[in-house]
Amino acid sequence: MKTIAIIGFGFCGKTLFIKLSKNYQPKTKILIFSKSHYSLSSAAFSELSPSYILNVPAKKMSAFLDRENDFCDFLEKYHSTLWTEIGENGFAPRYIYGQYIDYILEAALVEAKEKAVDFEFINQEVVRVFEEGELALELENGDCYEVDDIVLATSFKQAQMPFEFNSKNFVKDLWSETSINFHQNPPLNKTIGLIGSGLSAVDVILSLKKNKFIGNIIAISRHGNLPKKSFLSAKVDLIKVADAKNGVLFLCLKIRKFLRENPQFDLRQVIGSIRNITQELWHNFDEKNKQLFLRRLISYWNIFRHCAPIDSVEMVENMIIDGQLVVKKGSIENIENVGEKISITTKNEEILVDHLVNCLGFEFRADKYRLLSQMMSEQLLKKDCIMVKSNHPKIHLLGGLNIGRDFECTAVPELRLSVSDVVGKLL
């Protein structure tokens, strides 16, 4: 009997189970370890707020490599009014994508039972992975399981400020259960501060606006930049995989020269044009150039790569014009309670708000994840240039955990490939 352990049951864990079940091999047992019940979509795709929308067009959001229209077909069948409105190039609400993931999972569970797939869902957190002759997992309740293969499909958590701060008016984790009241019953005539000005901040701003918010919003981030508008791809044939051998500086100069000579394009189109070869470019950079990119260019990449729907950005821009939204550039040095207010201190000023929301992105420091830290201490994982990599032939990483190896690996198109690759190794 071969035992496969899946740790984590978000998008990657669910789609991995679906593919393993569909291609089930006899004498295989699948163990799924997650604190969340298997039929529930993750918080990021739940109904916390119907205003939160995907940042990728519907036509690119199928969970399956071999069924490219699967999500679009789901929309057309179960949300026909929305489908008529947005079409394949539109952006669906996140909670509807959560419904889609639940839908395909439920169908897979029915099929798995019909095929007598041997699987078990264990509602426990894995706190230790070790090897004593065989690979084994220890759970928070002390139970241990010996397994043959381990797939780490754990999700990223949200980054936090480097100092402690607590307040009933501080949303520390945007996707936690404790944030439900803020999402569903937001304060409508207060001053709200946002830590960060990326896609999560845009989500919160739009949700407040659609809830008839009449107060003021102050977004604070290191660079003070908002996401750019999404666009229909223009034909740009500039960067080749072979260019990677010349290094990051060469690529920057090549792009700068092109944009100077072709003012009808901007950096979004150039970055969009290398979408399908980003991983190959990253694989062909040496360690020196990877570190140079991460040190000097990653913030600009994030601004121009991670775009928001045009309607969303225009609504945010109108709020800035109307004075309802202010975006400030600065590093936060301290946050403290001052009476009923929250004081945010940057290098240049003190900002007072009534409520504060953490809109920072993912946490990429491996030592902030208990299980990853433990596995590194056991030498089952190794630190790489961003996160971690496997140091054991029977431990496989899925999705965003491969960011150091692949760089571009957190969007659904890359996640599907990652899942397919791991399935090929397991079967």
Language model: regions and residue ranges:
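Flavin (primarily FAD) cofactor-binding/catalytic cores of flavoenzymes
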Residues: M1-H37, S42-A43, T84-K245, K254-L427
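Conserved phosphate-binding loops in N-terminal lobes of ATP-dependent enzymes
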Residues: C72-L75, I101
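A basic- and aromatic-enriched beta-loop-alpha substructure that forms the phosphate/nucleotide-
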Residues: S80-T81
